[in-house]
Amino acid sequence: PNNPTGSILNINELKEIAKVCIEKDLYVISDEIYCELTYEGEHASIVQVEGMKERTILINGFSKSYAMTGWRLGYATGPKEIIAQMTKIHQYAIMCAPTTSQYAAVEALAHGDEDVAKMRESYNQRRRFLLHKFDELGMTCFEPQGAFYVFPSIKRFNMTSEEFATRLLEEQKTAIVPGTAFGASGEGYVRVSYAYSMERLKEAISRIEKFVRSLS
């Protein structure tokens, strides 16, 4: 799943990317930090495509799926010769992740699947809530298939995403991220995270609604 839109690539789209990579002899770095937070269907990875396992460096971690953001623990898998060179840099730049974090990660992998499933269902409920609310406000919103963000359009308000986000913060004390934080093509959109309680989201959307109504 993508940040900020929550969109995903299906296996057929990944196969098309793989064709180009194999033809041009390219390596792929695939950041799959949100893979466990896929709401509809199964997560697809480019390493599943024939011929791509040996040319893909897959990056993942525990921050999103296990809500271990502060533990700063991640991992990478890939071709042996590349991982060997990555290890040389890593061991002298960082040495290793704290042992406490490593033990916590082992427990998460061994016993955390049920918690991940519950968290995913909770995110899904919040996702549906925000999609419905933004639809009511007339803010067109792509339906995210993963992660925990929505990316509604603000184009009808005739202001930049930076201005919209700044004014919302100043006037309603509610923080969102302007779409341009993710590149020029994000202009006209804002990112809203639903990695909060439903109670907080209801308050946030109420403030966003007040702000939007004031622009009419």
Name each model-derived stretch.
Residues 1-216:
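PLP-dependent class I/II
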